[in-house]
Amino acid sequence: MRKKPIIIGVTGGSGGGKTSVSRAILSNFPDQKITMIEHDSYYKDQSHLTFEERVKTNYDHPLAFDTNLMIEQLNELIEGRPVDIPVYDYTKHTRSDRTIRQDPQDVIIVEGILVLEDQRLRDLMDIKLFVDTDDDIRIIRRIKRDMEERDRSLDSIIEQYTEVVKPMYHQFIEPTKRYADIVIPEGVSNIVAIDLINTKVASILNEAK
């Protein structure tokens, strides 16, 4: 009988350090079959819209995501079957024609701002983490990331943050903190929290042997 993979949900606000926490877990288990799947990969296809319409999309709202597809593909991985994960093109604001083949793993980290918002997704998780970071730090990180990696202007980033990102955080993301098993202040720099999480994952892996 095939053992079920450990599924770890990692959430928090945009620019809050979710990816860094996820990578800290990944790097602690170099000999395990472990991967990270980003909720951002499942933004809905918008190829039927004009570019002008796409840029107005609220990417911090639950309806922006094809969470049904993510749940479907996670269940496939749980059953031991590979999946083709979509790739999102941030410069065109729609789904790319490419996909990435993902084979089943022993540990799957599910990372994204709204991965604890949907109960069906939460029910698949063994460990749920919320990375809790101050608003000021998150906006600075978001500006740096979006200008360097997504070719965004400073004005557009600030406008999106004040009109969409911040209000959506308080409406949809922050309330999911109550579902977390562990809340991590300071993100990846919280060594005690990271060590506790890695110890728990190692314990579950050992029990499954």
Swiss-Prot record:
Record GO biological process: CTP salvage; UMP salvage
Domain of life, source organism: Bacteria
The entry's keywords: ATP-binding, Cytoplasm, Kinase, Nucleotide-binding, Transferase
Entry GO CC: cytoplasm
InterPro entries tied to this protein: P-loop_NTPase (IPR027417), PRK/URK (IPR006083), Uridine_kinase (IPR026008), Uridine_kinase-like (IPR000764)
EC code(s) of this entry: 2.7.1.48
Signal peptide limits: none
Chemical reaction(s) catalysed: uridine + ATP = UMP + ADP + H(+); cytidine + ATP = CMP + ADP + H(+)
Binding site for ATP: 12-19
Record-linked Pfam families: PRK
Family note: Belongs to the uridine kinase family.
HAMAP family with a match to the protein in the record: Uridine_kinase
Protein name: Uridine kinase
Organism: Streptococcus agalactiae serotype III (strain NEM316)
